[in-house]
Amino acid sequence: MAEMMRIRNQADLATGLEALLDIDPRLHAIARQAGPLPLRLTEPGFEGLAFIIVSQMVSRASADAIWRRLCEAMGTAEPAAYLALGDAALSLGLSRAKHACLSGLASAVQAGDIDLFAILDQPVETGIAELTRLRGIGLWTSEVYLMFCGGHADVFPAGDVALRAAVGDGLCLATRPDIRETTRIALTWRPYRAIAARLFWAFYAARLRREAAPVPV
C-alpha cells in the first residue's frame, strides 16, 4: 500500500500548494486573493471531533461561543466530563441532535468501541466508514476530522456550503455547484484535495471577510 500523504506542518502545506498550482493553473489567481493558508491542524481525539460536531451547520462565531460554554461547564474536554453534564448541555446552545451525537460518541470512546487516534492512520475510506457508523456523524464531519485532526492531504468536504460557494465563485461558474459536481471538480486536485479545500476556504474568507472554515487557525 502506498504511504498516505499527510499535512503535518506549514512546510508540507507550502509544498503541497505548489504542486496543486502546477496541477491546476486556474488556482493561481485564487491563491493570490486568498493570501497565506492557515495550517489549521488541531488535536485528535474526543476533543477535536467534539468541536467539529459542535460546528455542524452553524457559523464559526456560534460554534466558538458554544464550545467555550461547553468547555467551561466540562472543565476538561473528555468523554466522562461530557457525559456528566447530562441534559444540562442543552442549555449551553446545543441542539438535541448534537447532544445525542456527542453523548453517543463519548459513550463509544469510553467503552473502547472506537479509537479516534488509530483511525487516523487508516486509509480515508476506512476512517470514514468507522466514524459514520456512529449516530449523528456523517460524511462532512468525518472528512473534516480526517483533514484537520489527522492531516490527511486528499480529502475534500464537498458537503460544506461555504466551500461550494467559494469553488463556484473562484472558478467563475454560472451557478453554485452541488455536492456531486463539486466532488467531480475536486478530482482534478488529487492527491492535494485537502490543500485545495484550505485554499478555497481562505479565498472565501478574503472575499467575504468572514471566516467559514470549520476549525480555527
Regions found by a protein language model. Give the residues of each.
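A general alpha-helix detector
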Residues: 48-53, 85-88, 126-130, 162, ...
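Alpha-helical ds-nucleic-acid-binding substructure associated with the helix-hairpin-helix region
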Residues: 7, 26, 30, 58-135, ...
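Structural motif
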Residues: 39-47, 92-97, 186-194
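Short alpha-helical scaffolding segments that buttress acidic/His motifs in well-ordered protein cores
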Residues: 49-54, 102-106, 145-146, 196-200
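A broad detector of the eukaryotic-type serine/threonine protein kinase catalytic domain
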Residues: 54, 87, 110, 114, ...
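A positional/architectural concept
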Residues: 15, 21-52, 57, 61-75
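C-terminal accessory module of base-excision DNA glycosylases/AP lyases that mediates lesion recognition
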Residues: 1-37, 125, 139-217
